[in-house]
Amino acid sequence: MKIGIDARLFNQKGVGRYTSNLIENLLEIDKNNNYVLFVRNEDFDQVKLKIKNLKLKIIGVDIPWHSIKEQFQFTEILDREKLDLVHFPYFSVPIRYNRPFVITIHDLILHHYPTGKASNLPLPSYAIKVLGYKYIIKKASGKAKRIIAVSKSTKEEIVDHLKIKSDKVVVTYEGADDKITNQESRIANDQRP
């Protein structure tokens, strides 16, 4: 299979760390499929150095997430690659994309707390952003072949709030970074770094 991964958040915190760890570990265990990573141009060289795999193609795309360009230009780029499947590790999916895809939903925090307190946008702009988020996450969830939820409670929220059938949502817990697990081992064995 030819599988695409939206890795535009590769060097960001949170979802970016999830994405980079997912890619590194997936490429380590999967020797059968071919992968295409879509990364920001500014991250291209770093991703190429960090991930060495013969079955990997890296494409630089300067398309910001949550943008109009994402909805139109990114769809065209994805279509050109004729992918069998795309994984969007974040809710921001080009809703015009009509080939098979999987989406990871980490939480539905904006459904519960759409206050704007965590944003530096003016309230009217933030309200539009929340409406866009709700529209895109609902559309993407409906079109996705599968939805990855990072916990049972997130799965329950997806089923309840987005009205998605339970069997479409798969719970896959996020793993801990090796740096953390190695640190915990040293602490447990009372060793100093």
Which residues make up each language-model segment?
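Carbohydrate transferase catalytic cores enriched for Leloir-type hexosyltransferases
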Residues: 1-193
